[in-house]
Amino acid sequence: HPSNSYIYLYGDMNMEEKLRWLDEKYLSDFENEPVDSEIHLQKPFTEMKEVVQEYSIASEESEEDNTYLSYNKVISTTLDEKLYLAFEILDYALLSAPGAPLKKALLDAGVGKDISGSYDNGVYQPIFSVISKNANVEQKEEFVRVIEDTLKDIVKNGINKKALRAGINYHEFRFREADFGNYPRGLMYGLQLFDSWLYDETKPFIH
């Protein structure tokens, strides 16, 4: 039912003509219905949760150095536009930029052989993740300790300004170029609208 739909138009067009067509060919066939589609905040954990999942490996593979460790934190909501952008930049500066401090700390500690990060801001409550690949399950406590000690040190002493500037420049270039590879630009703009529009109908353009 269109009462529970989101419609966006992209491109150089006669907007009045397109809106009239939508009304005549589609929307006018329906009565407006109230829809309660509000997504509520998840109740926060009182303590850190540990989740263990198994995955298949080949019979000739060893379980040694074949564990994935993941550290995940909820970061406010996607309606906080400053944090939304800040964590996109921090994700790059901490885990992707040359000499990224969090990545370097984990590699220097020998916790895994490949370190990556992600900031999933396509959900109401974005999730910042640090992932260690080719680690071992007995390293999980050290994994958490290194992450938290490194972040506390960065909070106390500051982050490398060059890394932070590189993150800002990287995202500025990406925004200016609006290059989405093989994906149509209009489609990607629409998907980005949903990062906030789904949770507050008055804020479709904050990102």
Label each region the model flagged:
Residues H1-E47, S59-F87, Y92-H207:
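Charge-rich, well-structured scaffold segments of protease-associated domains
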